[in-house]
Amino acid sequence: MRTQIPPVLLFLAVLTAATVQILGGPVQAHQSADPFPSTYPDPAVPLLSLPTEFRVRRTTANLTMAPGKPVEIFNATGAGCIRHLWFVFGEQDIEDLSIEITVDGAVGPQVRMPFRSFFGALLGFEAYPIDSAGLVNFPNFTVTNDPMIPKKASPGWNLYLPIPFSKGCRIILNAASAKNGGGMIDWQQYRGGVTLTPLRFHAQRSIAQPGKPTEPFPIAETEGTGFLAGYVMGWRQRDRSDMVFHNGGTRMLIDGQTDPHVICGHNVEDDFGFSWGFNQYQTRWVGCPYRDNRGRTDQDGVFYRFFGPDPILFRSSLSFTSAARPDDYEAVSYFYKVPGSKAPPMVAPQDWQVVGPFPDGISLEAFQESEDDLVRHLSQGDWPGKVTVGAKELTVHELRPTYGWVRLEGVYQTRYPYPRTDQSVYLRGTLNSTSRRRATLRLGLDNWAIVYLNGRRVAVLDHAEEFTTARIPITLDKGANQLLIKTNNRQNRERHLWAIHCAVE
């Protein structure tokens, strides 16, 4: 006897089969294959690849800060990465508020600076909006009748630069006066044993009120292995003799101990991709969030640049500076480096003396004319404060190198802060050796050079087009060896750079 299937059950069976076919098979209770890649590049810092095996976390903070009492707002142990910081404060004046960030139990914080500076609000300027890959700030200019909201309410401060950590991370706020506000820290918690980048977040701040035309203004200076992720810089014009932008631009002196090379800027706005001064446009990577144009020689402003598409890598050191006028400057740089990484030791003169200028730097023929008497005179021991050359009495300048770099652009200037061109100078340093030995002198520069060791000419270099490093075979005597270098400065591809790098391999 055959059992008849009721029509309604037959209909349900057909419907179920069709549904399974449409969905691609029966529903699985657990997917064995992980649909995500093991890592993904950070959108603000693509050079960092971060794990995808994480739990999404948020730590919130209700801030009631007593004067002078630090408040810990975040303290995580284990491995993780902060992806987003957000803060708001009821007080309009937070100039006395500071932030510290310490990762993996470092001896000192990787970040310690005024809160507003860290979030790109520089030189005490009124809060302004920032819409970039790394920083996003939302000032609230809305005036309401609500007595609880200040007439110019505190901005929403946001950071999107990742802060990875393998052992833990701690964030502390401190203020000299009472503060009330809130914060949210969005972060990812990694499982134990996760493979995490060795690079750790750092930030540095520099301020000069005013700057000195004879000294480069520091933006970032660090030793080790890492990369520059971005920076924000502000200008307040005090000197009305010329436009605030006309300062000769920035210099990046990279890997002095291992592979000296340079990146040279142009002028202020040009270094950020702009033209003809401050103009308030913002993109993910470059922008001008603030300007106050009161006249051609009376302007203030802020620029930012994040190097997501073109990070600046360094493997032993970075010295990042700007030429300066007697204006106010403030800069904050954001970079990542491997903790504890150090450059290899370098044999180089620890002190230099320089004398000049001489008017023979315009042609190679004039530059190479014999000066035996002068060379013998300058190769004898330390120079006094003044050196007489012919009828001229020239001042001797004492210089100390940074990572082997000797900077000359601030010593001789036609008009600040531009270095003289078509002039030459002599530099003198001492190389000490414990024995008589053969060695290699590594000399990097972007001009001409004549090199003397213990009064003997050992090399003539023509690097007039761009910065190049030469390796010169030399023989060092036991004890002190007198190194004398004649060099010049001309306009070339490096634009206004007047620096040399010297070391013995």
For each predicted feature, which ranges?
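Aromatic-lined ligand-binding clefts that engage carbohydrates, nucleic acids, or primary amines
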Residues: S433, R437-Y452, L483
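Short strand-edge motifs at loop-to-beta-strand transitions and within beta-strands
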Residues: L159, Y304, L427-G429, T468-I472
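Bacterial N-terminal signal peptides
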Residues: V8-Q21
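Accessory carbohydrate-binding/adhesion or oligomerization-edge regions at the termini
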Residues: S341-Q413, T430, Q482-E505
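Beta-strand-centric surfaces of beta-sandwich/beta-rich domains
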Residues: H30-P345
